[in-house]
From Swiss-Prot:
GO CC terms: cytosolic large ribosomal subunit
Keyword Ribosomal protein: yes
Annotated CDD domains: Ribosomal_L29_HIP
Protein's GO biological process: translation
Protein name: Large ribosomal subunit protein uL29
Gene Ontology MF: a single term: structural constituent of ribosome
InterPro entries linked: Ribosomal_protein_uL29, Ribosomal_uL29, Ribosomal_uL29_sf
Protein family per UniProt: Belongs to the universal ribosomal protein uL29 family.
Length: 62
């Protein structure tokens, strides 16, 4: 998700999105560890999404 799209969300929606993205990252890491993940580039992409969400939450003062 792009930063501009994330900035339009409310603080509660961002927190929900953060939890969802962190769970996705956990699942990706688990799949990678068990050799079930084919697209390993999804892990850094999920990390970047977490960082984007955290940055926007800090900008909004949450």
């Amino acid at each position: 998700m792009k930063a501009a799209e994330l900035r339009k969300l409310s603080i509660d929606e961002l927190k929900d999105k953060l939890a969802e993205t962190r769970k996705e990252l956990f699942d990706l890491r688990f799949k990678h560890a068990t050799a079930q993940l084919e697209k390993t580039a999804e892990i850094p992409a999920a990390k970047h999404n977490v960082a984007r969400i955290l940055t926007i939450l800090k900008e909004k003062g949450a």
